[in-house]
């Protein structure tokens, strides 16, 4: 829980995978590393069943931000640090996005450090008969 946080994102993330990095950035938790998210953050509702027993869903709701502006849908969330994973490198065992995210977390750790909160006094969860602890 302590120390810098970095989130890896890419185009394989949509829906909640779009919303989470959006909120991560909005709350100032830390930088986003990778590539743009997919950009599909809509609400869907089921429709009545089809005569053959099949079904489908249709998008009916969008996402707008605290300023009342439509956000994320069709644009996704862009990274703060763009790093692409080359398939040949990944097949060879490398993970450039992970490596960049770890490097950024270590850089933030060195430049910003960690400020630990004081531990609160332990709660009293029981009382002995006669009022003793």
Where are the regions a protein language model picked out?
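C-terminal "post-core" interaction segments
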Residues: 1-133
């Amino acid at each position: 829980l302590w120390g810098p946080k970095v989130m890896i994102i890419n185009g394989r993330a949509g829906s909640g995978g779009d919303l989470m990095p959006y909120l991560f950035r909005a709350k100032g938790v830390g930088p986003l590393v990778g590539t743009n998210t997919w950009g599909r953050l809509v609400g869907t509702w089921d429709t009545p069943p089809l005569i053959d027993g099949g079904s489908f869903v249709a998008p009916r709701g969008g996402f707008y931000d605290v300023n009342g502006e439509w956000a994320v849908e069709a644009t996704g969330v862009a990274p703060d640090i763009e790093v692409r994973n080359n398939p040949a490198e990944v097949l060879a065992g490398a993970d450039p996005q992970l490596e960049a995210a770890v490097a950024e977390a270590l850089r933030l750790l060195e430049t910003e450090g960690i400020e630990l909160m004081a531990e609160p006094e332990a709660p009293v969860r029981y009382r002995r008969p006669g009022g003793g602890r």
